[in-house]
Amino acid sequence: MHNGTPVGPVAYTPMADAAAERGLRLIICARPGYGDSTPRPGRRVADVTDDVAAVLDELGAPRFVTVGWSGGGPHALACAARLPGRCLAAATMAGVAPFTAEGLDWLAGMGEENVTEFEAAVAGVEQLSDYLDTEAADLATITGPEVADGLGDLVSAADKAAATGEFADYLAASFRASVRTGTAGWRDDDLAFISDWGFTMAEVGAGAPVAIWQGDQDMMVPWSHGTWLAAHVPGAAAHLLPGEGHLTLGITSFGAILDGLLASAGLG
C-alpha cells in the first residue's frame, strides 16, 4: 500500500486486518525522505518502483496487488506501468491526477491549504521548503482529537465526522511520523506530483487492471481528479461514489477495494 502525502509508514489496524482476512500481507514502504528512508532529491513518481521491487524481493513476494491513497495513488499507478506481470492489479483511493493533465484544472476544488502548498511547489524548492517547515511544526505534535480541526478547509463535513476515535489516532500518528526526520519526503512528493511522472496513462492501462475510487465530498483531491483518471486510464474500472470524502473511503471502502483487486488479478 502506498500512503498519502504527508503520511509516514504507519498502518491502520482495521486495514491490516482486512488484508489478513483475504490472505494478504499489508506492506507499507516509507518513500525516500520519510522516516528513516534516505531522501532521493529529484525523484519521479516512477522511481518508487525501484524500492517496491527491492522490498518485495527481500520479503520473497514475487507478485502483488497495490492500492495508493491520495498522494499514494500515482505511485500505485507507477507499479502497474513499470512492474507489469509482477503487479497484478492496482487501485487508486482518492488519488491525484497528473498536474499537466489535459482538460483538468488541477487545483480547482481543493481546500485553501492545498492550493497554497502547491502554489509554493510551483514557485520553487526554497519556497516550498519554507512553507512545509512551518506546517510541519504543527504536525509534529498533533493528536487524534486535533486532527479534524487541524486539517482546516481540507476536510469536508463527511471527513470531519469520520476523523474520530481510533481512526483519528491513526491519522495523527501517521502525520507525526511523516515529519519526524524533517520534510524532505513531503517536499519531494509534491515536486514529483507537479513534474513528469515518468510513465503514461496508456502504460498504466496496459500494465495491469486498474480501479479508480473517488468520492465527491473530497476537499483534498477533488472529484475531478477521479473522473479524469477514470476517463484516461484505458480499461479502468470507475468507482465514483457520491457522499464519500477523502478520509471516509479508507473506512467504508477498503475491503471492497481489496476484493476488487483480487478479482481483477484472478485471485478472488
Regions found by a protein language model. Name each.
Residues 110-199:
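Alpha/beta-hydrolase
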Residues 1-38:
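Conserved HGGG/HGGXW glycine-rich cap/lid loop of the alpha/beta-hydrolase fold
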Residues 233-268:
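Catalytic active-site module of serine/aspartate enzymes centered on a nucleophile-bearing elbow/loop
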Residues 31, 95, 241-243:
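Active-site loop/turn elements of alpha/beta-hydrolase fold enzymes
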Residues 47-65:
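Conserved acidic catalytic loop of the alpha/beta-hydrolase fold
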